[in-house]
């Protein structure tokens, strides 16, 4: 998310200066990150060591996440995203809204179709490419076997989430590479299905360079079982105060941001894809139910 004042200044100097500094080189204010608050559905955290070594749990759930990602890649769904700015009276004073269908073209290639996208009324901030990247991919984070090599994963404990027994892990990127987005935060993994059911954190990096700030709020994503086997993202909420520093020609500004993303209408595409769950082929369900969304 870019400060609208900063955007105006940058447009004025764009012909004079080429921004070549890599996003990965921007300094990160780690102390500014406050995760989303947990509701009453999160029970007591058991900090005792698990019966199974954490490394084994991590290996198993990463493999299951890979299976989930493969399954998700063969589903169509609708994504409804809303980004709002909130004033000092806790009222919405600007909004960006878009409805997209994630579908397949006639050649079977995965693509996105904009269903509805009214003009943005955001005044104090402007949507950046990284905001769109987070909405399209980051908020539905999956920690697969391929991705886990890029993360430090630390076992925290065991906790129930709405009666689901979960292992809890803290995750953070080992190295931030140019043009890449990573999760920094915490995940809850179903102790039976070994799949992520809740993600709480933020996507990094933030760009903190003056006249080029690009900041992002913390978020939580909930998953639910959609096909009877895998846990699919159904709802994301992000909220926080973005602290934009002052610069040449503009003042410092704090902007209250609220994001919501809903994922609905999951449907399996085609008939040639095989659902593999725990190493076994599963017959596809006759009908895909719409997952109930967490409010």
Q: What spans do the regions from the language model cover?
A:
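Bacterial N-terminal signal peptides that target proteins for export
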Residues: 2-13
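Bacterial N-terminal signal peptides
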Residues: 12-22
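Sec/Tat signal peptide C-region and signal peptidase I cleavage site
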Residues: 23-27
